[in-house]
């Protein structure tokens, strides 16, 4: 797994790149002088950390004299060393700074700072394996590009959980779906004590074409919503399916969705209220 040095101009998206790598399982160290890259490698190796990313930029300007030597020493030990450099036009950097009202680390007028920073970081840019111009990129597009350029797999997980509305919806769901319009096995005496995990209960829930059509529309909407979340750079999406008590209908729907949406990494994480025993 790569050891990644993230650098670039202030306002070019380094924080977004670091968050992306952290979400991809990297151990992140921000604002690390080049002289400490080797020590970070040793520490990570001792702790069994396979994915490591550090950032070095204008904030460490007093230590950049050791840049080339530090790079050469680490590259001999890490064949997978990668340097990622981000940049953008001065006009875009200025606009981003005006939006955030942050002070540039070099502390002069912004346009002068940008010019000085480009000169200061030129040796780092020259070492870069990957240079990304973020001028026209959104944060989500930058995240995707970072993963693509580093050839990292972006794992996405669609989490499905069932619940009963009488016990309140979960607070951490991205999407809540109400399936109380489906046929209710609670009113069938022989099905009442059973759960939506059982074929007989699921067969009753999806017993007619209207129920099948309802399910297909739910499935397609969940696919659309989760797909949009993944395209936006998210690594997970949680869908909560609710019926009255959380024992029958919501369980059956969650299980069927998990089987139908495996391409989105779908899995049932919890049947929260299935054992409460109030049915519905």
Curated annotation (Swiss-Prot):
Residues annotated as binding GTP: 57-60
UniProt xrefs under InterPro entries: P-loop_NTPase (IPR027417), RapZ-like (IPR005337), RapZ-like_N (IPR053930), RapZ_C (IPR053931)
Binding site for ATP: 8-15
An example Gene Ontology molecular-function term: GTP binding
Domain of life: Bacteria
Keywords, in A-Z order: ATP-binding, GTP-binding, Nucleotide-binding
Keyword Lipid metabolism: no
A Pfam cross-reference name: RapZ-like_N
Segments traversing the membrane: none
HAMAP family to which the protein is assigned, alphabetical: RapZ_like
Homology family: Belongs to the RapZ-like family.
Function: Displays ATPase and GTPase activities.
Protein name as annotated: Nucleotide-binding protein Dgeo_0723
The species this protein was found in: Deinococcus geothermalis (strain DSM 11300 / CIP 105573 / AG-3a)
């Amino acid at each position: 797994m790569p050891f990644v040095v993230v650098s670039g101009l202030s306002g070019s998206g380094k924080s977004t790149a670091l968050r992306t790598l952290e979400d991809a399982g990297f151990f992140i160290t921000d604002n690390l002088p080049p002289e400490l890259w080797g020590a970070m490698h040793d520490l990570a190796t001792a702790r069994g950390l396979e994915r490591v990313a550090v950032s070095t930029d204008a904030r460490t300007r007093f230590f950049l004299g050791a840049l080339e030597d530090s790079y050469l020493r680490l590259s001999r030990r890490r064949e997978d060393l990668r340097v990622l450099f981000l940049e953008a036009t001065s006009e875009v950097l200025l606009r981003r700074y005006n939006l955030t009202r942050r002070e540039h680390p070099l502390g002069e007028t912004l346009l002068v700072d940008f010019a000085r920073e480009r000169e200061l970081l030129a040796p780092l840019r020259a070492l870069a394996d990957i240079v990304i111009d973020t001028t026209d990129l959104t944060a989500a597009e930058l995240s995707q590009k970072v993963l693509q350029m580093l050839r990292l797999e972006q794992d996405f997980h669609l989490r499905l959980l069932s619940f009963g509305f009488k016990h309140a919806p979960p607070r951490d769901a991205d999407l809540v779906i109400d399936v109380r319009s489906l046929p209710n096995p609670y009113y069938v005496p022989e099905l009442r004590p059973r759960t939506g995990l059982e074929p007989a209960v699921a067969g009753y829930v999806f017993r007619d074409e209207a129920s099948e059509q309802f399910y297909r529309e739910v499935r397609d909407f969940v696919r659309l919503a989760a797909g949009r979340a993944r395209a936006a750079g998210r690594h997970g999406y949680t869908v909560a399916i609710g019926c009255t008590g959380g024992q029958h209908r919501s369980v059956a729907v969650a299980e069927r969705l998990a089987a139908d949406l495996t391409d989105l990494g779908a899995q049932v994480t919890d049947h929260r209220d299935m054992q409460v025993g109030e049915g519905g």
